C-alpha cells in the first residue's frame, strides 16, 4: 500500500492474496500502512456482506477486519477530481478470488448486484462524469465464468472496469454497450 501511495495511485481494492496471511496479516498490513504516515491509496470495496455476517454474529477475525477497514477508511466508492473531470471509483471482489482465498473469513455479495446498487447511489448523490470499477474478479475464456465481462454487461453505467485477478493479457480492450 505504501508503494502504491508512493506511485500516486489513487485507489485500490482487495485481492485474494491479501488474505494469504489470514485476517491478522491483512489487518496488520492495513494498520501499518495507515500508521506509517506515508501516502496510501484509498481502499474501495462495495460487496462485503457485513449484514449477513453481523446477523450471524461477527467472529473475532471478522471483527478484526471490520475494525481495520474502518480505521483505514475503506469505503464502497470514492470520488476523484482529475482536472475538470469527476470520477467515481468503486471496488469489487469476485467469486473466483474468494475461491482462491481459503483463509478469507468474509462473506461477499454478488459483484453485479453490489455494483448496481453502488452505481445507483453514485448517480443519485454525486455529480460525476465517469464511473470506474477496480475489480479483483477477472476475465475467463469461458464467458459464463468471465466475471468482469458479466459485470460490464449487467451494469452498463460503469464506464471502465480495471480488471485484475486472472492475469489475462488483452491486446485490445473489451467493450460492451
Regions found by a protein language model. Give the residues of each.
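Acidic, metal/ion-coordinating pockets
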Residues: 1-177
Amino acid at each position: 500500500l505504501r508503494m502504491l501511495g508512493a506511485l500516486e495511485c489513487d485507489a485500490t481494492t482487495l485481492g485474494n492474496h491479501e488474505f494469504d496471511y489470514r485476517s491478522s496479516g491483512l489487518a496488520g498490513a492495513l494498520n501499518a500502512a495507515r500508521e506509517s504516515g506515508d501516502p496510501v491509496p484509498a481502499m474501495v470495496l462495495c460487496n462485503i456482506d457485513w449484514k449477513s455476517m453481523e446477523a450471524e454474529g461477527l467472529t473475532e477475525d471478522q471483527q478484526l477486519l471490520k475494525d481495520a477497514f474502518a480505521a483505514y477508511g475503506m469505503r464502497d466508492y470514492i470520488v476523484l477530481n482529475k482536472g475538470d473531470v469527476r470520477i467515481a471509483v468503486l471496488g469489487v471482489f469476485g467469486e473466483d478470488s474468494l475461491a482462491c482465498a481459503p483463509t478469507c473469513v468474509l462473506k461477499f455479495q454478488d459483484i453485479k448486484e453490489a455494483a448496481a446498487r453502488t452505481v445507483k447511489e453514485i448517480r443519485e448523490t454525486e455529480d460525476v462524469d465517469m464511473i470506474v470499477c477496480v475489480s479483483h474478479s477477472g476475465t475467463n475464456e469461458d464467458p459464463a465464468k468471465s466475471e468482469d465481462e458479466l459485470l460490464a454487461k449487467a451494469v452498463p453505467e460503469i464506464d471502465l472496469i480495471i480488471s485484475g485477478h486472472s492475469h489475462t493479457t488483452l491486446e485490445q480492450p473489451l467493450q460492451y454497450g
